[in-house]
Amino acid sequence: MTTPFKRVHLIVMDSVGIGEGPDAKAFDDEGSHTLKHTLEGFEQSLPNLQKLGLGNIEPLPVIDKEVEPQAFYTKMSEASVGKDTMTGHWEIMGLNIMQPFKVYPEGFPEELVNEIETLTGRKVVANRPASGTQIIDEWGEHQMKTGDLIVYTSADPVLQIAAHEDIIPLEELYDICEKVRELTKDPKYLIGRIIARPYIGEPGSFKRTSNRHDYALKPFGRTVMNELKDNGYDVIALGKINDIFDGEGVTESIRTKDNMDGIDKLIETVQRDFNGLSFLNLVDFDALYGHRRDKPGYAQAIKDFDERLSELMNHLQEEDLVIITADHGNDPTADGTDHTREYIPVLMFSPKMTDYHELTIDSTFSSLGATIADNFGVKLPEFGKSYLKEMGVEK
């Protein structure tokens, strides 16, 4: 079957929102605007994002409006009730999540802690939101002496369990995480991911190892990725995409170390011969800068991404379509450390297209999945609509 585009490269700039969503008040996120507030006072230009028309979606500092943008552009609000990474990505791929995952800014409830201790025969310590390196520095020596489980969370719906590899062997830690995964499927907890976080070393020089393992929930329904895979298309997951979807609908998974490594891996993937979807998450915007409210770091990360775009464009083939978007906001100037309920930007371009213009603003991220499904001639998701016709794409 001949498709309009042989390959679609979907890039999610994790948390790079473009202004408060229509229901931001319900999430206490009125006034949030990740891109605008991040770039205020930033003194460097972003020529590639400007050229594509990012400044045409919303007035932004350092990004002027383009008379002839080099991409289709629009923004989308989220239909699902959550503002976390899993919900955003699942909605992009066609699902509408009506029961939000739960976050635990005060730590996990005593009832759950007691259940974990009974289930594992080990005591739980820490039990609060923290960065992984910080919590291991704080509790690592204690864990080595006692064999307790260092349990912590973040602004995302995750439960992380850290243990020294010499004290709790990997297989036991993985077994513990599998048990906790089953336990937290209970709707009263509904935690998105359980993460094993092994570490090594001595007090003062602890180091997390690459033996991390994620135990995610499977998507609550079939996604566009399932449809693509079942119809013989490649679905190449880069970065944490495989974890977000628990491997569902993925034909190949490629790990990345950080944003720049993610772009490297994407460019390598673009240079291969495949037919289908490559799906990249760039997590640093969110994990390193948004949650930590590091506005200068966030702005520089956007600049670094902008600089790599020309390199990516140089490797594109005629039959490629690139989609750049986000999954939620995380305004580094907002109170607290949580995500913000925002519109997401959408930029779509291809070497074989020239007549670019604004697209209709949509009320669900699923229209991205619908566009991808429509391109490859597979079943469209229940939610969202394809943009191909509005883009002037002949099928």
Curated annotation (Swiss-Prot):
<comment type="pathway">
    <text>Carbohydrate degradation; 2-deoxy-D-ribose 1-phosphate degradation; D-glyceraldehyde 3-phosphate and acetaldehyde from 2-deoxy-alpha-D-ribose 1-phosphate: step 1/2.</text>
</comment>
<keyword id="KW-0413">Isomerase</keyword>
<feature type="binding site">
    <location>
        <position position="14"/>
    </location>
    <ligand>
        <name>Mn(2+) 1</name>
    </ligand>
</feature>
<dbReference type="InterPro" id="IPR024052">
    <property type="entry name" value="Phosphopentomutase_DeoB_cap_sf"/>
</dbReference>
<keyword id="KW-0963">Cytoplasm</keyword>
<protein>
    <recommendedName>
        <fullName>Phosphopentomutase</fullName>
        <ecNumber>5.4.2.7</ecNumber>
    </recommendedName>
</protein>
<dbReference type="GO" id="GO:0030145">
    <property type="term" value="F:manganese ion binding"/>
</dbReference>
<feature type="binding site">
    <location>
        <position position="291"/>
    </location>
    <ligand>
        <name>Mn(2+) 2</name>
    </ligand>
</feature>
<feature type="binding site">
    <location>
        <position position="339"/>
    </location>
    <ligand>
        <name>Mn(2+) 2</name>
    </ligand>
</feature>
<dbReference type="GO" id="GO:0006018">
    <property type="term" value="P:2-deoxyribose 1-phosphate catabolic process"/>
</dbReference>
<dbReference type="GO" id="GO:0008973">
    <property type="term" value="F:phosphopentomutase activity"/>
</dbReference>
<keyword id="KW-0464">Manganese</keyword>
<dbReference type="GO" id="GO:0005829">
    <property type="term" value="C:cytosol"/>
</dbReference>
<feature type="binding site">
    <location>
        <position position="327"/>
    </location>
    <ligand>
        <name>Mn(2+) 1</name>
    </ligand>
</feature>
<keyword id="KW-0479">Metal-binding</keyword>
<comment type="similarity">
    <text>Belongs to the phosphopentomutase family.</text>
</comment>
<dbReference type="Pfam" id="PF01676">
    <property type="entry name" value="Metalloenzyme"/>
</dbReference>
<comment type="function">
    <text>Isomerase that catalyzes the conversion of deoxy-ribose 1-phosphate (dRib-1-P) and ribose 1-phosphate (Rib-1-P) to deoxy-ribose 5-phosphate (dRib-5-P) and ribose 5-phosphate (Rib-5-P), respectively.</text>
</comment>
<dbReference type="GO" id="GO:0000287">
    <property type="term" value="F:magnesium ion binding"/>
</dbReference>
<dbReference type="GO" id="GO:0009117">
    <property type="term" value="P:nucleotide metabolic process"/>
</dbReference>
<dbReference type="InterPro" id="IPR017850">
    <property type="entry name" value="Alkaline_phosphatase_core_sf"/>
</dbReference>
<dbReference type="GO" id="GO:0006015">
    <property type="term" value="P:5-phosphoribose 1-diphosphate biosynthetic process"/>
</dbReference>
<dbReference type="InterPro" id="IPR010045">
    <property type="entry name" value="DeoB"/>
</dbReference>
<dbReference type="InterPro" id="IPR006124">
    <property type="entry name" value="Metalloenzyme"/>
</dbReference>
<feature type="binding site">
    <location>
        <position position="328"/>
    </location>
    <ligand>
        <name>Mn(2+) 1</name>
    </ligand>
</feature>
<feature type="binding site">
    <location>
        <position position="286"/>
    </location>
    <ligand>
        <name>Mn(2+) 2</name>
    </ligand>
</feature>
<dbReference type="GO" id="GO:0043094">
    <property type="term" value="P:metabolic compound salvage"/>
</dbReference>
